[in-house]
Curated annotation (Swiss-Prot):
Catalyzes the ATP-dependent amination of UTP to CTP with either L-glutamine or ammonia as the source of nitrogen. Regulates intracellular CTP levels through interactions with the four ribonucleotide triphosphates. Residues 291-541 form the Glutamine amidotransferase type-1 domain. It is an enzyme of class 6 (ligase). InterPro entries: Class_I_gatase-like (IPR029062), CTP_synthase (IPR004468), CTP_synthase_N (IPR017456), GATASE (IPR017926), GATase1_CTP_Synthase (IPR033828), P-loop_NTPase (IPR027417). The gene is pyrG. CTP binds at residues 13, 146-148, 186-191, 222. Its EC number is 6.3.4.2. It comes from Methylorubrum populi (strain ATCC BAA-705 / NCIMB 13946 / BJ001) (Methylobacterium populi). This is CTP synthase. GO terms for molecular function: ATP binding; CTP synthase activity; glutaminase activity; identical protein binding; metal ion binding. GO terms for cellular component: cytosol. Keywords: ATP-binding, Glutamine amidotransferase, Ligase, Magnesium, Metal-binding, Nucleotide-binding, Pyrimidine biosynthesis. Pathway: Pyrimidine metabolism; CTP biosynthesis via de novo pathway; CTP from UDP: step 2/2.
């Protein structure tokens, strides 16, 4: 029988429901159970693909091309299980599907209502395709009391009524704030949050309490009494120094044991957490450190680069060093000399992005790395800016630019719906070979033998995830390669450039895809492993 755990949040947002869900899944995996993770997002957007990264954080892209919430990245990194479009749904997607069916006449003239039509659609999503799993963990985005979340809470309430007794658990993540003047943790916000949850028909079975210090026995007893849960079900979720300590912290607090007790399942031995202990040891006790500059466009919200920062951490784990990050807004380099900001650093990473803002700053960062022989890693937009820099500085194409920024005489970078014949832009229809305007999901690529990137992968055939509208123009390949910028990887048909590298440079690589989306703490991505290794070599020179 499949068992369902619904993870809700209260008191404040951004408590870490995604990490809590991922950590619980890791603990259940460590006990040998088959686990699936799913996310319900109450916002009205169909998906986060068009949402501002400075508001919502990064868009996590799955192998099958879904643009999803960043929490799915946590799910993949902690469990090693690939997510798909079937693991994330929004209010916008639910309503779009229902309205499409209504316009088609599928409801045979019925009045379409939130109950039962919207709630039934949510239930169908949650319950679909779970027969092969022991546990399905479902995170509900937002906070209890949000108006847009009500249909989702009603749907999971109904699931609890309709499923066999003992097959559903409601876990509520909440906050116990410490008030210095009173010298104590306050339970009242949690009591009110649970009261709100109970008012819509859901009695939490387990309270997972975020706090920065131990919960006194009296406070734990009070929470159990007034929130109507067992005292043993009040679980301490203490703040930790790294997210990779969370599974072990939850294990110590007894979360996995309480979950099994709720389902009346007898634990068989102890969870196998050796690999988590090894990772934590490497994170907390590195043998050295390097400093990497991230020259980005959305540095005001670090969640905009969540997978990227974690992938850099994984690269550090692989090389047993701590990776320190220097966040630099790309626009700064359009006004100021990059040298004072970048001198003494051990690597420069220019990540993806959209739009003209900060583009020239990223180009200047690429030039600085090339001229000073500093390791450079350009991802998506970062690769495109590196190619434009090479075209201008090495090939003498002074007007080289991207059509993303307007008309240009030298379209070194163009839309996927455009193709170049010489310097002429040929418009491509959406149904032509190059597809639509956004290249999403996993695509295969072929790497040239003997290149630095092929050596790092240990293979010439790879598959990586993409999210971009623009591509480097292959018409410029010959003149750029003559100046030392090698097109080291292409699509299998040879039409689209996937990777470039500067020959003669210690480590200068650009990739059109997003390798950070496939990096795991237990399987660091080879490019991040190689980039940090190059940064270590650079640290010995400065």
């Amino acid at each position: 029988m499949t068992r369902y755990v619904f993870i809700t949040g209260g008191v404040v947002s951004s408590l870490g429901k995604g990490l809590a869900s991922a950590a619980l899944a890791a603990l259940l995996q460590a006990r040998g159970y088959r686990v699936r993770l799913r996310k319900l997002d109450p916002y009205l957007n169909v998906d986060p693909g068009t949402m501002s990264p400075t508001q919502h954080g990064e868009v996590f892209v799955t192998d099958d091309g879904a643009e999803t919430d960043l929490d799915l990245g946590h799910y993949e990194r902690f469990t090693g299980l690939p997510a798909s479009r079937a693991d994330n749904v929004t209010t916008g997607r639910i309503y779009l599907d229902i309205i499409t069916k209504e316009r088609r006449g599928d409801y045979l003239g019925a009045t379409i209502q939130v109950i039962p039509h919207v709630t039934n659609a949510i239930k169908a999503f949650v319950l679909d395709g779970n027969d092969d799993y022991d546990f399905v963990l479902v995170e509900i985005g937002g906070t209890v009391g949000d108006i847009e979340g009500l249909p989702f809470f009603e749907a999971i309430r109904q699931i609890g009524q309709e499923r066999p007794r003992g097959s559903v658990c409601y876990l509520h993540l909440t906050l116990l704030p410490y008030i210095p003047s009173a010298g104590e943790l306050k339970t009242k916000p949690t009591q009110h949050s649970v009261k709100e949850l109970r008012s819509i028909g859901i009695q939490p079975d387990i309270l997972l309490c975020r706090c920065d210090r131990p919960i006194p026995v009296d406070e734990r007893r009070k929470l159990g009494l007034f929130c109507n849960v067992r005292e043993s079900a009040v679980i301490e979720a203490r703040d930790v120094d790294t997210i990779y300590a969370v599974p072990l912290s939850y294990r110590e607090a007894g979360l996995d044991r309480e979950i099994l007790a709720h389902f009346q399942m007898k634990p068989e031995g102890e969870p196998k957490l050796e690999r988590w202990q090894n990772i934590l040891e490497r994170v907390r006790n590195p043998e050295g450190e390097v400093t990497i500059a991230i020259v980005g466009k959305y540095t005001g919200l670090k969640d905009a680069y969540k997978s990227l920062t974690e992938a850099l951490t994984h690269g550090g784990i692989a090389n047993n060093v701590r990776v320190n990050l220097e966040w630099i807004e790309a626009e700064v380099f359009e006004r100021e000399d990059p040298a004072p900001f970048l001198e003494g650093l051990h690597g420069i990473l220019v990540p993806g992005g959209f739009g003209q803002r900060g583009a020239e700053g990223k180009i200047r960062a690429a030039r600085y790395a090339r001229e000073r022989n500093i390791p450079y890693f350009g991802i998506c937009f970062g690769m495109q800016m590196a190619v434009i820099e090479a075209a201008r500085s090495l090939a003498g194409i002074t007007d080289a630019n991207s059509t993303e920024f307007g008309e240009t005489r030298e379209p070194v970078v163009g839309l996927l719906t455009e193709w170049m014949r010489g310097n002429e832009l040929e418009r491509r229809a959406a149904e032509s070979d190059l597809g639509g305007t956004m290249r999403l999901g996993a695509y295969k690529a072929t790497l040239a033998e003997g290149t630095k990137i092929a050596q790092m992968y240990g293979d010439t055939e790879i598959s990586e995830r993409h999210r971009h509208r623009y591509e480097v123009n292959m018409a410029y390949r010959e003149c750029l390669e003559a100046k030392g910028l090698r097109f080291s990887g292409t699509s299998p048909d040879g039409l689209l450039p996937e990777t470039v590298e500067h020959e003669g440079h210690p480590w200068f690589i650009g990739v059109q895809f997003h390798p950070e989306l496939k990096s795991r703490p237990f399987e660091p991505h080879p490019l991040f492993k190689g980039f940090i290794a190059a940064a270590i070599e650079q640290s010995r020179l400065v």
